Amino acid sequence: MLILVKYGPENPGERWKLESATPEDQIVLIQNGIFWAIAEPEAIQGKKVAIVKPDLEARGYSAQACKLPLVDYAGLITLLEESHKSMS
């Protein structure tokens, strides 16, 4: 399953999504969801996570400093097209 995380750590619904994710699920941090990687990296530790690069950079963070895989918007569309199920 593809799980889109749009809001930051203050959102209980997004926390539930991350806690419910299985090792097979692909999590994509979009918009303010990128703050999980910065403020609460332990919440995504051991999970298959990617960050939307333009969203990271729009919030003033460097792509070079990021240790997680990055995708652009075209890559996000590809993930959506390839996924049989998604949660957003």
Regions from the PLM with identified roles:
Residues 12-13, 34-39, 57-61:
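Short, charged/polar "capping" segments at the starts of alpha-helices
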Residues 2-14:
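Short, glycine-rich nucleotide/cofactor-binding loops
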Residues 44-47, 67-69:
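Short, hinge-like loop/turn segments at secondary-structure boundaries
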Residues 1-2, 88:
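Absolute protein N-terminus
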Residues 19-23, 39-46:
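Short, conserved loop/helix-junction motifs that constitute active-site signature segments
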Residues 61-88:
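C-terminal structural segments of small proteins and small subunits
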Residues 26-32, 48-55:
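Short internal beta-strands
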